[in-house]
Each structure stands twice: as C-alpha cells, then as structure tokens.
Amino acid sequence: MDPSPLLALLLLLGAARALSTCQRLDLEAAKKKRIEAVRGQILSKLRLTAPPPASETPPRPLPDDVRALYNSTQELLKQRARLRPPPDGPDEYWAKELRRIPMETTWDGPMEHWQPQSHSIFFVFNVSRVRAEVGGRALLHRAELRMLRQKAAADSAGTEQRLELYQGYGNASWRYLHGRSVRATADDEWLSFDVTDAVHQWLSGSELLGVFKLSVHCPCEMGPGHADEMRISIEGFEQQRGDMQSIAKKHRRVPYVLAMALPAERANELHSARRRRDLDTDYCFGPGTDEKNCCVRPLYIDFRKDLQWKWIHEPKGYMANFCMGPCPYIWSADTQYTKVLALYNQHNPGASAAPCCVPQTLDPLPIIYYVGRNVRVEQLSNMVVRACKCS
C-alpha cells in the first residue's frame, strides 16, 4: 500500500489542529468560562477598560423616555427573532457540488411564447435536466439565477432601471421574487438572484419547463402595459441570423442556474443528519430533552451575583447560554476516514480532528446602565446564544 495518501492526510489534520480550539470541558468549567467571556464582551463593546466607578449617591429614577426606548428595543428584538428563518441544518457542514444548468435558447415550437419583449425577457429551463443534474429536492442547498449584464454603449452609460424577477406558473400567473436597481456601465457585470425556493418547487413538481421573467418596474400610477422599454442588455437574447447564429451560440454567455447540492452518494449521511432537530433553544430546552451531544446549554448570568456589577440598571441578568457537547453524527463510525482519524488521535492525543460545538445564531442584548449619574441605553451584539452547530 502506498503510504503517501495517508501521510498527506495526517499532515492536513495536523494543520487543522492549529485552527481548532475545541477542548473537552466539564459543565461547571464551561459555565465559568462563559461568564468570564461575557464580562470581557460587555466591557469591550462599551469601549471600557474597567467597570464605571459607582456613584456615591443612588441613581435617580429612570426617565420615561429612557424606559420607553428600552422597552421598544426589546419588543423589536423579539419580533425579529420570531421572523428569523431557521438556522441551517447539519448538512451545512458538507462540501457542495456546483452544477451549471443553462437556459434554453431556441425560440420555436413551445418556446415561441417566451420570446423577448420590449420590457421583459424570459429565462426558460428544462426541468427534467435540472432534476437529472441535482437529484432529489432534499439534496439542493442553494440555487442562483445568474446573467451577464452587457457593457453599455457610450451614449447610454449611467442608465439605471429598476428590474423585477418573477417566477412563472402553469396557470399563466407570476410570483414576485426579487427587485433591484441595475446601472448600465462601461464594463460587463454578472447579476445573481436567489431562486432556491423556485428550484425546490421544480424538483418537487411535474412541470416540464421552469420559467423566470425579468421585467422593468412599472409604477402603479402608470397601470399595467405601460412599463418602460428595458435599456439594460442581458447577454444571451441577441437575435442572430444564418451562420452568425451558430457562431454566436458558441461564444455567448447565456444565463444559467447555478445549483449547489450535496452529492448523491452522501444521501445517507444527509438523511441521518436531517433526522436531528435544529440545535436551538426550542429543541435543547424542550420538555423531556436530554441531549448529550452538541446543543445549547442554559446559563443565566446575574450581573450582581456573577460579575459583582451594580452599574447595569436593566436587565438584572440574562440568559447568555453556551454551546457544549460532542459532534459524533458528522464523524460517525461509518465515515471512510475513521481509521485514519483513530491513527491520528493515537499519535496526537491532545488534538481534536473532529468538529467543535460552536454558536450558530446569536441575539443582541439591550441594556440600561449608568456612568456616574448619566443614564445610557445601548444594544450589545451577539450576546445570547440561540442555536449551536458542529463546525
């Protein structure tokens, strides 16, 4: 057996060790470490080298406007947390394959309906090809529609238009996806739109064609049918004749969908990972949950008791939480490099070749504090651990 590949992998794992801070800690040690980290975070975020000196006289009652500002900030943060999309699952860890699926470029037969118009252009894709390239819906991680805005002529440089992207349905209806202002410049520019949800629908449905429409924004007061002509030129829609058409097809950069998907051979790992819930507070703090692996661990920090601080008026403390637990479901017993990892750990017992349990979602913390007799309201970023991941 040639030892070269094995040695190369061991060297790579040695480099990875230098980037890892993952260490085994008992629960009490982890709590103490988190409390000290919070102490340093708060002081550094407020640009303080030490806690403000305590006032000799008790602080006056909070002004109504300060209390109102603090309460409204808390409500806004709660609303944002409710609307926040769920964190990425464990499959975020794995490398993704990139698949390039160009749009259809013939305008005859059933495609004749999708010829470019003065104010709109259409991107038509063979959904059967998308399914063959990507595989199942569960394997798709992200999809982007990419197109090249061609450089503008000297007399139209600086032109700016509001363009809107829509997804087409079989019943001739359209769903708005994205809008953006695009400026024509003297250089080519790649434009990209997130179409992950649309491609997910293609992979789940039975449609033969998937269609996107890019249109010039039509102000409401003008009414439908009165949109400006599209002055932004997208490569791939030029109409050539005769021999020039075949030559142009070879060299033009047509719009395409870039699909990022897990390889099909990793479907078993994906299926196993998706059986796990998101490692957030809803799951980790749920009734009956006794998760031994990576999860959010509860930790309430009392500013007076744990930090010996009296200068923070509100809140009196907060749920800081922390991440803790092994990550066995990524480096499992059936992983192909298990033997190599075991050999590496044998020679490097203090190393951690496996991923670490680290924060994935963090929320801010609003506080009211005094500097002398002056009251201030501040929002401290990334203070509350809401979800963890293995990385």
Swiss-Prot record:
Motif extent (Cell attachment site): 241-243
SMART domains the UniProt entry points to: TGFB (SM00204)
Biological process (GO), any one: regulation of protein secretion
Protein name per its UniProtKB record: Transforming growth factor beta-1 proprotein
Chain segments carrying region Straightjacket domain: 19-63
Chain segments carrying region Arm domain: 64-270
Gene3D superfamilies referenced in this protein's UniProt entry, alphabetically: 2.60.120.970, Cystine-knot cytokines
PROSITE patterns registered for this protein in UniProt: TGF_BETA_1, TGF_BETA_2
Range of residues in the leader sequence: 1-18
Function: Transforming growth factor beta-1 proprotein: Precursor of the Latency-associated peptide (LAP) and Transforming growth factor beta-1 (TGF-beta-1) chains, which constitute the regulatory and active subunit of TGF-beta-1, respectively.
Family matches, as InterPro entries: Cystine-knot_cytokine, TGF-b_C, TGF-b_propeptide, TGF-beta, TGF-beta-rel, TGFb1, TGFb_CS
Designated gene of the protein: TGFB1
Organism name: Gallus gallus
Disulfide bond residue pairs: 284-295, 294-357, 323-388, 327-390
Subunit: Latency-associated peptide: Homodimer; disulfide-linked. Latency-associated peptide: Interacts with Transforming growth factor beta-1 (TGF-beta-1) chain; interaction is non-covalent and maintains (TGF-beta-1) in a latent state; each Latency-associated peptide (LAP) monomer interacts with TGF-beta-1 in the other monomer. Transforming growth factor beta-1: Homodimer; disulfide-linked. Transforming growth factor beta-1: Interacts with TGF-beta receptors (TGFBR1 and TGFBR2), leading to signal transduction.
Keyword Signal recorded: yes
